[in-house]
Amino acid sequence: MNSIIGENMDDKHLIETELKNNTLFTGRIINLRDDDVLLPNGKQAKREYVEHRGGASILAVDDDKNVYLVRQFRYPYREVLLEIPAGKLEKEEDPATTAARELEEETGFVGDIKPYGLIYPTPGYTNEHLYVFLAENLKRTHVHCDEDEFLDVVKLPIQTVLKDILDGRIKDGKTCYAVLKYAVENKLL
């Protein structure tokens, strides 16, 4: 089966052009924009979106096919979510460095890390991009969360995590992406 993405298709009829950059709010982590754009049909429109420098996440799998996740309260949803470790990119920081740091800080593990993908979590209203990594050959160190982070580390068999994703109990997009990719690559589905 061929994909239509990246097959020399002409995208000109889809592209919007920025006419004016309007920054409404500049924050520590995000900026809010309301840009004027030129549509492909020649009309003008507004595009509200959140600027974010991006982040890195990491799927940690041990030799017995257990996955290390974190349970943490996510204020925008007013809910405790189960997720792979992740964090925002620091200025000019390599995404692999961010992922390794977050893995150790949040779970107390280090391991062999390899790139595992790039996702756009919510392309309808933010330019955030999230690098995904895989960590294997895990070695225990110690957890040392940031002072404003409160979380539990959870070790689960990957089959349990897959079931929880497919049953809708794990709702976090980066976690679903990483676990499902791992499951497909390792013929676990």
Please describe what each predicted stretch is:
Residues A45, G54-S57, K88-K174:
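Unchanged
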Residues D167-L189:
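Long hydrophobic alpha-helical segments typical of transmembrane helices together
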Residues N66, K139-T141, L188-L189:
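Short helix-loop capping/hinge motifs at secondary-structure junctions, enriched
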Residues I4, K12-I15, R47, A56-R101:
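Conserved Nudix-box catalytic region and its N-terminal flanking loop in Nudix hydrolases
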Residues L38, Y75, K139-R140:
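Active-site/binding-pocket entry motifs
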Residues R28-R33, G54-A56, R78-V80, P85, ...:
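A generic structural signal for short beta-strands and their flanking turns/coil linkers
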